Amino acid sequence: MTTYDLFLFAGQSNMAGRGIACTQFPEGAPDLISGAGAEFRAISDPTRLYPIAEPFGALENNPTGIFEPNMKTGSLVTSFVNTYFQNTGVPVLGLSSSKGGSVIANWQDHDDYLTDTITRLKSAQTFCEQHNITL
């Protein structure tokens, strides 16, 4: 049995991954430490886990929910997962559900971003139950 701590990387612009490297700040995201975590892709491929890599969540575009193709360019996720794993010894199962430029009202009604987020979370929980993964 595998155990993960599930993190829902959700929210607005600060979580949506608009990071870029430039000549002034050329350092990119770190590589994932072996065993530190995995990504569950609830939208693009909910059949398996993927190694966490930047840009995190770039393929998780739901045309009826959170949809921002080609907008995610890098995030804090890999760095956070590495640090969390180094401090706890517990790998992270990451789930992307962020939408840059959104207002809180977009997260509060029927058929909104929160509804999409809850659906993604339930999909991850079901996958874990079916694959003997403890959260």
Q: Whereabouts are the PLM-identified features?
A:
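Cell-envelope and extracellular/periplasmic
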Residues: 1-135
